[in-house]
Regions:
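Acyl-donor (CoA/ACP) binding surface of acyl/acetyltransferases
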Residues: 1-101
Length: 101
């Protein structure tokens, strides 16, 4: 999904729901322009996608993977009720895999 900041009339990010690398789970991922950071817009958009995935799409859980060093992303995922499932080394850095359950 493309995320638009309505008040500013511009696209500011993307949220995606698709298969995770593990082949078992669906993953929510997101990217936002730095100008959109700190306004709660990513949280709002990811929350909508998670809600739809768990209700309308009928998924029993959704995961998200982010670098442990990305504290803002970790904080966002925790604020949505996601919990740390495990840590893995990937892409040359430690990643945390979060889950809705």
């Amino acid at each position: 999904w493309m995320v638009v900041w309505v008040e500013r009339r511009r696209a500011i990010g993307l949220v995606e729901l698709g298969p995770h690398k593990d082949g078992r789970d669906y993953e929510v991922s997101y990217q936002f322009l730095p100008s959109a950071w700190g306004h709660g817009l990513a949280r709002e958009a990811v929350a909508v996608v998670l809600k739809n995935a768990l209700s309308s799409a009928g998924l029993s859980k959704v995961i998200a993977e982010t670098q442990s060093a990305n504290t803002a992303s970790c904080r966002l995922l925790r604020s949505l009720g996601m919990v740390e499932q495990k840590r893995v080394e990937r892409y040359g850095a430690e990643q945390i895999i979060f889950s809705t359950r």
